[in-house]
Regions:
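Extracytosolic ligand-binding ectodomains
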Residues: 2-24, 28-459
Length: 459
């Protein structure tokens, strides 16, 4: 069936009230209409995710042990592997991803027509060896698609096995190094985040960008992304400074002092005072009195600085800017999606800063439904489990010969999920439509809304 532009049918719901997911401009969606949920899902028998500090080990569940998901019709079900850590240090997050996936499959069960997904959850134990065993197990059971693993090392370990069997992988990592050749990553890459916030800074007239990054693989990726984004936006790169990611704030402080040319600006102030003192006119005396209130003389050579930290770390580093006499009302701090946290908004040095984000409403609806079912607040990005399972369920309803082909998975019009619109590219990366928010005083607000179609990004 031909594509029908601007047709945005719902294909999943959070209960009867929330219509959040849509398959954008795709033949499959144009051929189907959602059914209404007539029954509430049974209360899940899965315990709420334990605290990350001490996750409780749990056995790998099987498809038969997941009461939230209605049993698929064996005659028309499509096996899909779900590979996440359900034991080990990351068990809590792995369980949250699985919980979210169960929600998606229950919601999608309301849609009539086509095959249904038979989810095959397996415990990767958070190790490459565990991931290999889990992948081999589900593929031996006929899995036609693998959702997960979580960690890039695990994805790298299973990729050759999946390719050998022609089974595509949709992983939860954000490491682009493992993407491609049948492996797709759903995670939020620093590259897409930096590009969005730097583009917005350019649209607001900022011209000179700096970056303060940890000296780590992640920091190097951010630094490279800043260079590319600055060049693409036609801006000027001021400086990129790095620090030991394990260093205390006291050891990061000298890096910020040098980056802001603090000593040079103090020397400029002393020189200016000496020049004015040598003069004996009233104007010079007035100017000298004004300089007495200053700590430095002259501005820093950047209008914005990218700081890819979060939590307590960003709250410790950001105050170093005003400490070294940088006016944060004029110099914008630019962050990552991890700044979308009320605790981060309590830092005065970040007020006025910008960061990328996903649309609030779908995430809030997902979180409310998750809390109702599991009695706990989902951790950030647990919704990727929902998006992945919903993607699999929708594609499973297409013709068996084309349901999980590269062409189906990489539909250019994309999909809309809990975290906004996204599409998977032939290179295996996820492109997303992100909003930009501004940090307020213990609050944040959207200053550039997320697009609702990819046409808005390309036009």
């Amino acid at each position: 069936m031909p594509l029908r532009p601007h047709f945005l049918p719902t294909f999943a719901r959070f209960g009867a009230r929330f219509a959040v997911f849509a398959l954008l401009l795709a033949p499959l969606a144009a051929c189907q209409q959602p059914g209404r949920l007539t029954a509430q899902p049974p209360q899940p028998q899965v315990a709420a995710p334990p605290a990350p500090a001490a996750p409780a080990p749990m056995p790998a569940p099987t498809a038969e042990s997941l009461p939230l998901v209605p049993p698929p019709d064996a005659g028309r079900s499509v096996p899909v592997g779900f590979l996440v850590p359900l034991s080990g240090p990351a068990a809590a997050f792995g369980q949250a991803l699985l919980n979210a996936a169960q929600m998606a499959l229950f919601d999608l069960a309301a849609i009539e027509g086509g095959a249904e997904v038979a989810l095959l959850p397996r415990d990767t134990k958070g190790t490459p060896e565990g991931a290999i065993a889990a992948a081999e197990d589900v593929m031996a059971s006929g899995a036609q698609l693998l959702l997960g693993p979580l960690f890039s090392a695990d994805v790298e370990a299973i990729a050759p096995l999946a390719r050998a069997r022609g089974v595509p992988v949709v992983a939860f990592t954000n490491d682009y190094a493992v993407a491609g050749d049948g492996v797709y990553i759903l995670g939020f890459t620093p590259e897409m985040q930096v590009a969005r916030v730097v583009d917005y800074a350019a649209s607001r007239g900022l011209q000179r960008i700096a970056a303060l990054v940890p000296d780590s693989v992640y920091g190097q990726r951010v630094a490279a992304a800043v260079r590319v984004a600055v060049q693409n936006a036609g801006l000027n790169l001021s400086t990129i400074a790095s620090y030991d990611p394990s260093a205390s704030t006291n050891l990061v402080s000298p890096v910020v002092r040098d980056m802001t040319n603090y000593e040079g600006r103090r020397a400029a102030l002393r020189q200016q005072r000496q020049q004015l003192t040598a003069l004996d006119d009233e104007a010079s005396k007035l100017a000298l009195r004004r300089l007495e209130r200053l700590e430095t003389y002259g501005d820093v050579d950047f209008d914005a600085v990218v700081i890819p930290e979060s939590g307590g770390r960003i709250k410790a580093i950001a105050p170093l800017l005003p400490f070294y006499d940088v006016d944060t009302r004029r110099v914008r701090a630019l962050g990552t999606i991890d700044w979308d946290d009320p605790d981060t908004w309590t830092e005065p040095a970040l007020v006025g800063g910008w960061y990328p984000s996903t649309p609030d409403a779908p995430r809030a609806e997902f979180a409310a439904a998750y809390r109702k079912l599991y009695g706990a607040t989902p951790p950030p990005r647990a919704s990727l489990g929902y998006d992945a399972a919903a993607l699999a369920a929708v594609l499973a309803r297409s013709d068996s010969a084309s349901r999980f082909t590269a062409a189906a998975i990489t539909q250019p019009n994309g999909f809309a999920g809990v975290e906004g619109i996204f599409r998977l590219t032939p290179q295996g990366l996820a492109e997303r439509g992100l909003a930009v928010k501004e940090v307020g005083s213990r609050s944040s607000r959207v200053v550039s809304p997320a697009p609702t179609t990819f046409e808005q990004l390309t036009n």
